[in-house]
Amino acid sequence: MKIELASSYGFCFGVKRAIKIAENAGDAATIGPLIHNNEEINRLATNFNVKTLHGINELKDEKKAIIRTHGITKSDLAELKKTDIKVIDATCPFVTKPQQICEDMSNAGYDVVIFGDENHPEVKGVKSYASGKVYVVLDESELEGVKFRQKVALVSQTTRKVEKFMQIANYLMLRVKEVRVFNTICNATFENQEAVKNLAKRADVMIVIGGKNSSNTKQLYLISKNFCEDSYLIESEHEVEKSWFEGKNLCGISAGASTPDWIIQKVVDAIEKF
């Protein structure tokens, strides 16, 4: 059986940047998981003493606090800056962008629509920058019956599917006088999604590696599943099962933006042993 990696996969710019920041900081606490990958979080804790807190209320004797790649809410950031703790911002620049757009458009009198998961930390952070009306949706049907003002701004969670984002944009344009559409889906997300789609079309079995709580990894898995029925989402090599590969000729592999190369290689090694 041949194993083929997607043409684009794994660590994105924002994650690489955040990990380097955490490694350089050392002896610090992150506000929420730095990235959505438990294996890498454990490595940072073991090798660099970077521990994970659930919120700013858990800060006690820490001298350094790292803001996670997904960002935090505007109010939490303000509270954090009131303390004597050194604040190290590892928010991905692609996440900072919709935060700023949300704040600017809201202040300019626009209603704001965010395409994303309202329970995701990135979306919670972006939403907190709106001073006026803001709506978080995963589907245009959720906007039915909403009475917008004359002006609406649309942004997206950075890891969502472009096709769905455009459906929501089209829905708004048919119903609102002025719509400002800001494509805040990051390039790495788009490239990884296109790559997994192209590989899944040819593969007999697909393995998508990443955190089960990772939005971008889930999107990759769903795209893969759409084109290759035998698609599996795993976090580590320990979940790989021999039966998945019986009678298969091509195994495709993709990985989420928070998945390091060392985890991917362990999965490849495990599959090659079958």
From Swiss-Prot:
Active site per UniProt: E122 (proton donor)
Cofactor: [4Fe-4S] cluster
Enzyme class: oxidoreductase
GO molecular-function terms, A-Z: 4 iron, 4 sulfur cluster binding; 4-hydroxy-3-methylbut-2-enyl diphosphate reductase activity; metal ion binding
Keywords, alphabetical: 4Fe-4S, Iron, Iron-sulfur, Isoprene biosynthesis, Metal-binding, Oxidoreductase
Catalysed conversion reaction: isopentenyl diphosphate + 2 oxidized [2Fe-2S]-[ferredoxin] + H2O = (2E)-4-hydroxy-3-methylbut-2-enyl diphosphate + 2 reduced [2Fe-2S]-[ferredoxin] + 2 H(+); dimethylallyl diphosphate + 2 oxidized [2Fe-2S]-[ferredoxin] + H2O = (2E)-4-hydroxy-3-methylbut-2-enyl diphosphate + 2 reduced [2Fe-2S]-[ferredoxin] + 2 H(+)
Binding of isopentenyl diphosphate, residues: H36, H70, H120, S214, S215, N216, S258
Keyword Iron-sulfur assigned: yes
Protein name per the record: 4-hydroxy-3-methylbut-2-enyl diphosphate reductase
Native source organism of the sequence: Campylobacter curvus (strain 525.92)
Gene: ispH
